[in-house]
């Protein structure tokens, strides 16, 4: 069974997200710093009749990087071609995509950190000088062919910016750090989703959902759907704060947005390791999760909310973690 607070896409959520996707910056809720910067850069590029500089969007899953890429293309009034790092297996695949671009087009590569190195190297000249050199034939009959490309904008999205090579990272003129959403912005997103799908919800219920959604719109919309189900079966269809609390309690999502896995991590740190420090590998083995899963999916939110600290000697549970789980804090 999938974890309700997983910030990766589940089931039909890609279709749902396309339905909810804003078209322009003015409609995009949250990420104000990124939006304000992009608005200036986009207007300047349009004023000069140039392609927008290559743009890197990075941050945890579910924060709207793909949506932002589509919004940028709409603001520029150009087409967007979408692909992802794992799909482009060899340089010939990328050459075919690049050769199909029209002047000013946006090429969006999701999970760009997963591009094979041979493919990435083809991007260097394409991004910097809008050309590629490709080899045709093999052996003694092989020859290099120079192929000019129209000016285009590459938008790369990644959850692991640190995994990008320095040469690739240096070729992005614009970077946007997508951060966890404030509760007010998430409340607005929940109310917008409810309106689009004709769900009856009170403002207080929307606020409660926002507070428990880990700062992530994808999770907020997923929880909203599950609370709607609960309201229709256990209530009269209205999503109010009481129904919301009952539904989220049933789903093991507490007032801080922690689920059973988060609580298991904190309890293990406190009960088994005295609050830490404990190494990430050791902790992962103890809770039977992959190290990368703990590091990428669980730990960022626990750190952001102040339940866990990273130290040079390992992870440490904070006073807030002790108090939240009802333990007496005895640390010096």
Curated annotation (Swiss-Prot):
Entry comment, domain topic: Has 3 domains, the large (RuvB-L) and small ATPase (RuvB-S) domains and the C-terminal head (RuvB-H) domain. The head domain binds DNA, while the ATPase domains jointly bind ATP, ADP or are empty depending on the state of the subunit in the translocation cycle. During a single DNA translocation step the structure of each domain remains the same, but their relative positions change.
Keywords, in A-Z order: ATP-binding, Cytoplasm, DNA damage, DNA recombination, DNA repair, DNA-binding, Hydrolase, Nucleotide-binding
Name used for this protein in its record: Holliday junction branch migration complex subunit RuvB
SMART domains in UniProt: AAA
CDD domains tied to this protein: AAA (cd00009)
UniProt entry tagged with the keyword Nucleotide-binding: yes
InterPro entries for this protein: AAA+_ATPase, AAA_lid_4, DNA_helicase_Holl-junc_RuvB, P-loop_NTPase, RuvB-like_N, RuvB_C, WH-like_DNA-bd_sf, WH_DNA-bd_sf
A Pfam family that the UniProt record links to this protein: RuvB_N
Subcellular location: Cytoplasm
HAMAP family per UniProt: DNA_HJ_migration_RuvB
Residues reported to bind Mg(2+): 66
Region Head domain (RuvB-H), annotated ranges: 255-332
Highest rank taxon of the organism: Bacteria
Residues the entry annotates as binding DNA: 291, 310, 312, 315
Function (record text): The RuvA-RuvB-RuvC complex processes Holliday junction (HJ) DNA during genetic recombination and DNA repair, while the RuvA-RuvB complex plays an important role in the rescue of blocked DNA replication forks via replication fork reversal (RFR). RuvA specifically binds to HJ cruciform DNA, conferring on it an open structure. The RuvB hexamer acts as an ATP-dependent pump, pulling dsDNA into and through the RuvAB complex. RuvB forms 2 homohexamers on either side of HJ DNA bound by 1 or 2 RuvA tetramers; 4 subunits per hexamer contact DNA at a time.
Protein family membership: Belongs to the RuvB family.
